[in-house]
Amino acid sequence: MDIKSFEKIQLYGFNNLTKTLSFNIYDICYAKAPEQSKAYIAYIDEQYNAERLTKILSNVADITGANILSISKQDYDPQGASVTMLVAEEMTVPTLTPESLTGESPGPLPGNKPSPGSIVTHLDKSHVTVHTYPETHPLDGISTFRADIDVSTCGHISPIKALNYLIHSFESDIVTIDYRVRGFTRDINGQKYFIDHDINSIQNYIAKDILNLYHAIDVNVYQENIFHTKMTLKDFKLNNYLFGVSEEELSDHESASIKDQLRDEMQEIFYGRNVTKV
């Protein structure tokens, strides 16, 4: 479905649209022994601690042209971390969102921040949050790490331009992405706009070199301004999923069994349902 292109239209008051990006990544691992599972959880917990997550979210704010107002961060015991940022937009004249902030193309990596004008308003409904969830299966050696990132903005800022950077920031076997636009804004003649930028697919905001690594499917509800994409890695190399052991140290039977376990785990996560064992 093609959505009409938006010309720059002068708005009445501020842009009141709320745009929300939900980004969920999964890293899957197999550890042969319980102590190796514990070591993986400790490793991944340290890799994505609150300090590093704060840097990632700061770059998200930078890419979207937002101004950070406050930061709250916390590491949890025994594992996990969370960071919440309150951000404000940096724009001058209230118009429909500039192409550079929402154009249907991959967003920049850190260092290419859109040029802001003077700050005219603090929008307290704009925020960025991340939570991490390391966990391990009690019996079969499978461990997973999940990170949930939510970027909700009110005004010109669109979080979708940060998507390309977020995918680069995490080692992701599976990625689930949701984007939605809510509310409406008016032009100076009183006409409502329920979305202020072109979008046909979330995939158009992801660089081709990244997309080529994944199988990706879309489920979009255009009339409701709801867009959904999920991706799973194409290339399966067992050594990339082993922690504390290499494939060369395993018997052929062990390798085959672990591959089956990992593929089942990834399939269940990707489709969001348990696989029936035959």
From Swiss-Prot:
Broadest EC class assigned to this enzyme: lyase
Residues of the active site: 126 (schiff-base intermediate with substrate), 131 (proton acceptor), 154 (proton donor)
Chain segments carrying region Disordered: 96-115
Its EC number(s): 4.1.1.50
UniProt entry keywords in alphabetical sequence: Autocatalytic cleavage, Decarboxylase, Lyase, Polyamine biosynthesis, Pyruvate, S-adenosyl-L-methionine, Schiff base, Spermidine biosynthesis, Zymogen
Annotated InterPro entries: AdoMetDC_fam_prok, S-AdoMet_deCO2ase_bac, S-AdoMet_deCO2ase_core
Binding note for cofactor: Binds 1 pyruvoyl group covalently per subunit.
Reactions it catalyzes: S-adenosyl-L-methionine + H(+) = S-adenosyl 3-(methylsulfanyl)propylamine + CO2
Domain of life: Bacteria
Cofactor (UniProt): pyruvate
Pyruvic acid (Ser): residues bearing it: 126
HAMAP family per UniProt: AdoMetDC_2
Task performed by this protein: Catalyzes the decarboxylation of S-adenosylmethionine to S-adenosylmethioninamine (dcAdoMet), the propylamine donor required for the synthesis of the polyamines spermine and spermidine from the diamine putrescine.
Xref: PANTHER family: S-ADENOSYLMETHIONINE DECARBOXYLASE PROENZYME
Protein name: S-adenosylmethionine decarboxylase proenzyme
